[in-house]
């Protein structure tokens, strides 16, 4: 089957978009924490934003490895949070999102990748 038609392709695209958006959210959370005087939390959010950027890069590299080149567009439908509150709210939202990824989304994506024959994508 053409990779571009697989669920793994869709999941990698969702993951790339999600990690990219998470990076931006964490960058904004850092600004908010700094504004509230929480320098340690601001640095923690900035470090987490950097981690999300690295994750996004890994997903993009897998898309480029398997997809037809150049990949001009991948259509998919997904929901992403658009929250920005005070630092305590941002911490709770971050924990909620990271838990959702770790407990549900990424294990399901990995299972699908293995089933479709993309073991290295499953290992992300």
Residues covered by each model-derived region:
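Non-heme di-metal
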Residues: 1-124
């Amino acid at each position: 089957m053409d990779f571009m038609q697989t669920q793994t392709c869709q999941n990698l695209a969702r993951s790339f978009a999600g990690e990219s958006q998470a990076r931006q959210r964490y960058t904004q959370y850092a600004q908010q924490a700094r504004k509230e005087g929480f320098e340690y939390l601001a640095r923690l959010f900035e470090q987490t934003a950097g981690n999300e950027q690295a994750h996004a890069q890994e997903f993009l590299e897998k898309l480029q490895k398997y997809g037809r080149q150049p990949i001009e567009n991948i259509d998919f439908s997904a929901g992403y949070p658009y929250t920005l509150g005070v630092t305590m709210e941002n911490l709770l939202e971050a924990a909620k999102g990271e838990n959702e990824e770790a407990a549900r989304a990424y294990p399901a994506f990995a299972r699908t990748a293995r089933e479709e024959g993309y073991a290295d994508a499953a290992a992300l």
